[in-house]
């Protein structure tokens, strides 16, 4: 075979690569050779600065290789290559539109390489690349620069947050949006901010201020980008975390493969690398998680922002946004109003013209109206809208889907402001539970169930239900007035702990009566957590600090055990109420109070309320809660929540909505009751059946699927499976030999089998 002739350019390229390798190994010895190449680079640079568009392909190739060489060894000769970064910046800034594509990408890559070698800092790199990102007409160059900017910011914030760099870039993005509000260049600011927020590199309020300016821009695309950031940025974060968790390495599988496969250095390194990655993931999981607030919570001055957004993009008649984009802005405004409980009264009158069944995307308008409602919105402002929905949507002439959507929208509004409608309108709407359509019936029943919980007085007696009627009579249900907030008066769940302690006392008393006299003379020590075996040291100062401890006299201790026990058990049942306003001779006991309760009904209710308040706060004011008490209190709270969730569907639904109020409402939530009466088509049933099931190209048996799963995990078949699939003629010899064995040989084989099984098989896995 004849020897191939090597072209001159290939020789130069090979020489430069070889020179780079030698310089990396011994910089001092090859300083002169590098200086010669530096002079060649400088000459080519001057040619490119004079006329970059007219350069030949050979010159471009040569300059490309020289830039690559200098960039890789610039950190070894800092004195010679000091002007090199400025040369690249100047070349890229002035001639990025006329440079060759490959050379342009090499210059960008060389700047990034210099940043990684700490020849230049991140601020210098990003301030060079960002103007080119905005102004370059080349899509490939913009994509490359965007990728480099994101990766550099990620690396700069990898070990610790680089606040100085972040502030600089955020200021650049903010100025880009505010300098020209009509330009579409601000779209890059939205993309960069959204990506860094999604990756949790920027988590403070400054990126939210940048996106606020994007929402107030005059360019439609920039406004849409800003609105989508606030409406969907947190969901993107969660999806990214789920994707990262799916990529976790299976340690069990890696260990299994390392035991089965042949031991090589490559596999050992791969195993160690996977092990290190798993340890890093574990450290990340157990590390203290920083507070991760939603972007909507970090907005400065949400009231002013919501008002500006509404006036500029919704109330302004000159605005030419499409309906879809206006709905995005509306969703953001209503989310802000509902989340921060803002007062934007013109917003509610703006809704009136859109609340008709013929309006396009009317369910989205209904969902936004419900989002914008909260308990501090005046009922006089909301009531006309509810009446409009009832008149337009809920009538005998309306279609079932329309009526169901209207009733559900009214229910969502009433859930946030129960005073939004009159009793007459509520009675008319509740009567729709007799409708033949299932969706309308369920929507009306949902409205009735809601008012049974929050405002049963507005319902007729026959619609209130048993629990609401009993709660009204007992005074347990107290509807809140407009502007009134339900404040906590005691420790959450303290009554559960008090009830638990009373039950424990009663159990001890019953056990004491069954066993006869107590060995300790009838004295019962209350196990309040300090006397438990779990706590070795108890504090005596807490007992002597207050004046709440009952000390029994000697005469009581000397008395019979049964009398004291009867006395104690009687004292534990119900404490007598004493009217302290009377003199000692006119003390009124609980029994006398009960006798006179019929003559004074109002006084009885007041005294009962006072007694209830004293009873609830008794444990918190007279007892120091121990760690055991607090642990039990937490357990009782969880059990009470579980009972409530399993018991009452309406309460559960209300609590879920209050819990996820930040998620906002969608058109699907409003349309949900209308779907109840519909029969699913065959295609919908098949699609529902295929959900959460692996896609199968062909039908396979369970064993085949199990085998495929096993092979995917890198596991081989068992010895039992191998023996079963073995050729019959290959097993004949062993079978014949088994039959000819003597008893001694059989005994040896059995003993060897037992010994191997105890040792963990032939591989001795048990040792």
UniProtKB/Swiss-Prot annotation:
Signal peptide: none
Compositionally biased spans, kind Basic and acidic residues: 504-521, 680-701, 710-721
Keywords: Coiled coil, Nucleus, Protein transport, Ribosome biogenesis, Transport
SUPFAM superfamilies: ARM repeat (SSF48371)
Amino acid composition bias (Basic residues), ranges on this chain: 749-767
Location of the region described as Disordered in the Swiss-Prot/TrEMBL record: 504-614, 662-767
Keyword Signal in annotation: no
Function: Required for 60S pre-ribosomal subunits export to the cytoplasm. May also be required for 60S ribosomal subunit maturation and accumulation.
UniProt record similarity statement: Belongs to the SDA1 family.
Name this polypeptide is given: Protein SDA1
Species for this entry: Chaetomium thermophilum (strain DSM 1495 / CBS 144.50 / IMI 039719)
Taxonomic classification: Eukaryota, Fungi, Dikarya, Ascomycota, Pezizomycotina
Gene (UniProt): SDA1
